[in-house]
């Protein structure tokens, strides 16, 4: 009997949880389909659902409901946070400069590039071998009074957790807006914005069991950003357009579940991750665990296999019934290593053999056992193929 496939790519996206689907479905049907800006009963019903969702997201992250601005996802929220902060600074006569780390999500790096296209500049902070941001470099950048600093809470490729409280505090002391991409943090690490000097924070639904196409930017100071799209007056004019009510309801429910279950899930996922790492090392002794020397979120395991190509590893894992992902990107026909691993100082040859295994709500010990069982044969096959092709 064929075994069901194993999904270990939860950092890319997650299945919609049944409770979340149940909560959002009424807002896609004749019950409460109205436009939340309409004054009639259909609109009022939709508005009630939207505002309840706003309250749920706020409770999950430690914010006020009025600070939650719904977006189409993490990428839009990141752009609103960075480009919006830069534009607001320019309107105040400030410095048009965005400071980011070298291991940010591509959405953050692209938004910083967009600030350059507006006539500003970007500063990219280095990280150490464990993926931690260089705080001395941060202090030097803050001395130039940039418009915004953006440092992700949990890295999406290796799971490294930044000292976000210290970083936010330094930005606040310097009078600089601080944004964090918390997409991989929500539901995985303790998150309470009331304890942080954080101006802006991004969250996304499809990483925690809600559907794709919904996220939020938590805006704790509306003066810190300017709108980057233009239209109606929805959401204080910061994000015009008719809100995705069903998506917002889904995000609210998913965020509530994720935070309620976080402590127990963190223990469970951390145990699964460590068991997976140990069993993989037993089968592939020279395997490298990336970011191992730093605090990591419980759901992400980044490994590098010497003498192997990540794309080949992923293809053969898929054939063996295991879904994982790579941090590398194909550009102009050439595979380049992950910018995150390169920034952390991993040799190019090793970085080209890196893959990410990410756990989620439905991951089980059986999944770990299955991956550990198939990995040695997959690695041997890929290494043999690389030798035949003259790549090692």
Label for each model-derived stretch:
Residues 1-392:
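Pyridoxal 5′-phosphate
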């Amino acid at each position: 009997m064929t075994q069901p496939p194993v999904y270990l790519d939860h950092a890319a996206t997650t299945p919609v949880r049944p409770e979340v689907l149940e909560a959002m479905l009424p807002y896609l049907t004749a019950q409460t389909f109205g436009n939340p800006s309409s004054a009639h009963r259909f609109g009022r019903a939709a508005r009630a659902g939207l505002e309840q969702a706003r309250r749920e997201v706020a409770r999950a992250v430690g914010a006020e409901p009025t600070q939650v601005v719904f977006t189409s996802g993490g990428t839009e929220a990141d752009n609103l946070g960075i480009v919006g902060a830069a534009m607001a600074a320019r309107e105040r006569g400030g410095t048009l400069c965005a400071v980011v780390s070298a291991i940010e999500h591509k959405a953050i790096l692209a938004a910083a590039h967009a600030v350059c296209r507006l006539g500003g500049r970007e500063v990219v902070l280095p990280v150490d071998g464990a993926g931690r941001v260089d705080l001395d470099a941060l202090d030097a950048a803050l001395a130039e009074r940039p418009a915004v600093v953006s440092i992700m809470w949990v890295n999406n490729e290796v799971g490294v957790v930044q000292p976000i409280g210290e970083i936010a505090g330094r930005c606040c002391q310097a009078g600089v807006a601080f944004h964090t991409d918390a997409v991989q943090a929500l539901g995985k690490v303790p998150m309470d914005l009331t304890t942080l000097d954080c101006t802006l924070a991004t969250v996304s639904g499809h990483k925690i069991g809600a559907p794709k196409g919904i996220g939020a930017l938590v805006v704790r100071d509306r003066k810190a950003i300017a709108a980057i799209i233009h239209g109606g007056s929805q959401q204080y004019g910061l994000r015009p357009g008719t809100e995705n009510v069903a998506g917002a309801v889904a995000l609210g429910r998913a965020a509530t579940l994720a935070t309620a279950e976080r402590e127990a899930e963190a223990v469970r996922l951390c145990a699964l991750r460590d068991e997976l790492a140990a069993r993989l090392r037993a089968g592939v002794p020279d395997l490298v665990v990336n970011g191992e020397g730093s605090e990591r979120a419980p759901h992400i395991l980044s490994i590098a296999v010497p003498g192997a190509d990540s794309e080949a590893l992923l293809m053969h894992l898929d054939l063996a019934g295991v879904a994982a992902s790579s941090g590398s990107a194909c550009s102009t026909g050439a595979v380049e290593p992950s910018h995150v691993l390169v920034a952390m100082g991993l040799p190019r040859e090793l970085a080209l053999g890196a893959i990410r295994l990410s756990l989620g709500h439905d991951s089980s010990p059986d999944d770990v056992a299955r991956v550990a069982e198939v990995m040695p044969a997959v690695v041997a096959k890929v290494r043999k193929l690389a030798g035949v092709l003259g790549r090692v």
